[in-house]
């Protein structure tokens, strides 16, 4: 191991922790807010139980608008909001704000697409048996689409792992910040290669874990 990497090990562990912090907050926001938003988008679709075309079009437009923003631009545009929520515009907690804002509509659309795969006959059968709307959402839609939802969460985690690296450009901390400061500005190629290898390992862990979870859900 080169001397530069050995000297950076303490910072490297901190950077990994910051990356997990940003990713954890962003994914939590996506699940808690983006999940229900995706279900609502599906239910507002014409032909569904809460069908409301104007509301669906407005909500869908908002989701598409936020998703269309390049993350680096969204990161800068949300600096005032970040300062209000986090009290600062730098650091992993500050970077978690735009990550969460980007993750919510992204995951919502993935959830909507996953739920659309549920056979319409299953939903109609649940309605015919007198199931409430909440029961249909939880025991039919979510249950039937569970493997698709797990894979959607995988896509989200992998995508936003790269987004967390982008946050390093504006002082967001994490592995990306380490790569920028040492690998790019100081031309330490070994550090750059190490951070790339770490990101690849993290992506592979995400893919391995969630693919196993998806397989298990299909066996239930």
Predicted regions and their residues:
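Transmembrane alpha-helix signature in integral membrane proteins
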Residues: 12-43
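Short helix-to-coil transition segments within interhelical loops
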Residues: 115-145, 185
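Transmembrane alpha-helices
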Residues: 24, 133-164
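Cytoplasmic-entry segments and transmembrane alpha-helices of multi-pass inner-membrane transporters
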Residues: 40-77, 99, 104, 110-113, ...
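Membrane-embedded alpha-helices of multi-pass transport/permease systems
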Residues: 32-37, 93-97, 101-123, 154, ...
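Conserved small/polar residues in nucleotide/adenosyl-binding loops
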Residues: 209-214
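Loop-to-helix entry region at the N-terminal start of transmembrane alpha-helices
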Residues: 14, 18-22, 64-106, 191, ...
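Non-cytoplasmic
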Residues: 81-82, 152-202, 208
